[in-house]
Every structure is written in structure tokens, then in C-alpha cells.
Amino acid sequence: ADEEVEIVQRRVESLGRALQLPAEKPPLEEIRRVVTIFRELRSGVTADGKMKIKTPSSTLSTAEAISVINQGLSLAAHFGDGRMRASDVASGLVGAVVKDPVQDRVAWLEYLATVMKERSGWKDLYRSCREVTQ
């Protein structure tokens, strides 16, 4: 779990330097949340193993997690105050998960309602994802 988070963090930081993004380093917590969401949706079960969830058709690879975080950093740098927040990550997250507008949307909405909404400290990400999923 933490190995994937570290890979995403390292790649995002090196890409940010290469692109000279005028943004702060992405908060580790945002990277951790994206990696957790991808992992849970890939495996069809929550991290604690307590709940089975529908899996979308998308691959949700580590490379896609890097892309979602990079997109969030770019939004924060160019349209925000340089600090990446949940709202900066939400559209990339939804775009990565929902490839098929019917099947994937059902899996995503179920994940939002049953997992993300109930998770402690994830209300900001839940709200942002709900907004862009409409």
C-alpha cells in the first residue's frame, strides 16, 4: 500500500519540477486517498476487507493515479492558490474511474455513497466528487 503511495509521490514531485509547476508539493494525504480509492475499486473490496464493492471497467493503474495528482497540482497552480485540495483532484478522479458512462457510473456512485461518504476525514473529497459527477 505505502509503496504505491511512495511511487506516486516521487513521480509527481519529479514531474512537477520538470514542468516547473508553481505549486506546493501535493499533500501526502491526497495521494494516499487517490491510491486507496483506485486500489479499492480495482480489488472490489474496501481496504479493511469489510465491504465488497462494484469494480469499474477502468484499469486505475499507478500511472493513472500519478496523472490524477498531476492534474490536481496543475489546477491548483494555475487556477487556485498553489495548494492542492480535494476539489482539484475530483474531476481527474471521476474521469479516471468513469470510462463507461453507464456501468462505471453505477460503480462510482455506489462507492461514493457507501464508502467515501462514510469515511472519516473524507467529506471534502466526497462533496467535490459528488459535484463533478452530476
Predicted segments, located by residue:
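AAA+ ATPase "lid" subdomain C-terminal helix
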Residues: 40-47, 62, 66-84, 95-101
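Charged, alpha-helix-enriched surfaces in structured cytosolic catalytic cores
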Residues: 2-7, 25-33, 55-67, 71, ...
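Residue-identity detector for threonine
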Residues: 36, 46, 55, 59-62, ...
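Generic serine detector
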Residues: 14, 43, 57-61, 67, ...
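C-terminal engagement/docking regions of AAA+ P-loop ATPases
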Residues: 77-134
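Conserved C-terminal "switch" segment of AAA+ ATPases
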Residues: 1-52, 78-82, 120-130
